[in-house]
Structure formats: C-alpha cells, structure tokens
Amino acid sequence: MINVLIIDDDAMVAELNRRYVAQIPGFQCCGTASTLEKAKEIIFNSDAPIDLILLDIYMQKENGLDLLPVLHNARCKSDVIVISSAADAATIKDSLHYGVVDYLIKPFQASRFEEALTGWRQKKMALEKHQYYDQAELDQLIHGSSSNEQDPRRLPKGLTPQTLRTLCQWIDAHQDYEFSTDELANEVNISRVSCRKYLIWLVNCHILFTSIHYGVTGRPVYRYRIQAEHYSLLKQYCQ
C-alpha cells in the first residue's frame, strides 16, 4: 500500500481528502496533520515511510510552503502534491521549484484528484522499473505522451468509439439526470470498471461535471451530469 499523509488545518477538508484517498485502490491515509510541526513529527518519526504528502498552503498562522525546503534539505524521499486555493504565480513557482509533483487548485473535481494520485504512482513505478532510458521512454515519463503531440480528446487505449457512442447516447437522452457510475453501467450493460474509465475521460474533456455525495454509510458516491456549455461536443460522440 502507498502511505499518504494529509496536511490541512481544516478538519472537514482533511476528512474529505481522506475519503478520496480511500476510494483509490492501493492508497491509504496513514495520518493527518493540522500543523507543520505535527507533520514533521509524522514524516520523520513514522514507523512506515510516508510515500506521498498532500499539502495545503494557507494554514492559519503557517504557510505550507515552509515545509518544502525542510523536506528538501533533509533529502526526504516523500513526494508532495499541493492542494490549495492559492493560485498566484509566485506560490505556484515556489512549489514547482521545490519539486512538487502536482498542484491542485481548490475547489477541484474528484476525477482530477484521482488523476493526480494515479499519475504520480505510474511515474514512480516507471522510475523504479528502469536503470537507463532512451529519449522516447523519457518523453513518456516526463510528458505522459510521445514526443509527437496527441489530440487530447483522442480515446485512450482500451476505450472504443462504439461503447463511447452508446454511453453518450444514453447521457444525451437523460440530459437533466445526475447519474452514478453504477447506474450508467447497468443501463448500458457494461462493467463498472469500464464505465468509470469512459466517465473519467468525459470529465477530462469537460463534457461531464462530477460531484460527490455521501450515502447513509458515509461512503462517497460520484455523480455526473452534462456541462451545458459543452453539450454540442457530447452530440458529436453520439453519431
């Protein structure tokens, strides 16, 4: 399991992020910290190594950025993803300077959170798999694609236009309906895992918007609906 530490002084936000982490296979939240002092105590004294840190920046009287040089100087092996409402260029520049692997601006969509964690894991595994790289492999690792720029709306490997058309036709016929992965998968008769891959792609293309709801058990359920301003794009995939 990949151990994740959440650093955020807002208890509700920390709990929400903890639930997001719990929804991604292979990841577990091993602790939360509301101060940088508590965070350093966990990072440097935890029995299990902290693989990934989710770091807020605006923390009452503290600035989360102050943790980054501490980690850098200590040669800490934990990677950092910033999750913050800070969107100014100076803050982002400082974060990237200290090597954060991703930066999410609050409020963010659940699919973007999942993309950040799974994308980080994919790069980490790739780095551990090779001792040397050729240029094509390095381009794939750094840019996530070949050196030839690809159409961002091109379907990823494993997704088919036929199934996408079926899903989009159902969504088009239920424009005012907010649906879950399970509901759509049952309606079009495909597996939940496959359905989720298509939905994540549609969200990344800004065709769908996702929101999170909690049932009686407290388990988060992701629900989707059409983004009205991109309805014409959905119609293209219905053909």
Curated annotation (Swiss-Prot):
Keyword tags: Activator, Cytoplasm, DNA-binding, Phosphoprotein, Transcription, Transcription regulation, Two-component regulatory system
Occurrences of domain Response regulatory (ranges): 3-121
PTM-bearing positions, type 4-aspartylphosphate: D56
Gene3D superfamilies: 3.40.50.2300
Location in the cell: Cytoplasm
CDD domains according to UniProt: REC_citrate_TCS
Record GO terms (molecular function): DNA binding; DNA-binding transcription factor activity; phosphorelay response regulator activity
GO cellular component, one term: cytoplasm
InterPro entries listed in its UniProt record: 2C-system_Tx_regulators, CheY-like_superfamily, Sig_transdc_resp-reg_cit/mal, Sig_transdc_resp-reg_receiver
Transmembrane segments: none
Post-translational modification: Phosphorylated and activated by DcuS.
Coarse class of the protein's main subcellular location: cytoplasm
Top-level taxon of the source organism: Bacteria
Ranges annotated as DNA-binding: 181-200
Pfam families xref list: Response_reg
Protein role: Member of the two-component regulatory system DcuR/DcuS. Involved in the C4-dicarboxylate-stimulated regulation of the genes encoding the anaerobic fumarate respiratory system (frdABCD; nuoAN; dcuB; dcuC; sdhCDAB; etc.). Weakly regulates the aerobic C4-dicarboxylate transporter dctA.
Designated name of the protein: Transcriptional regulatory protein DcuR
Species of provenance: Shigella flexneri
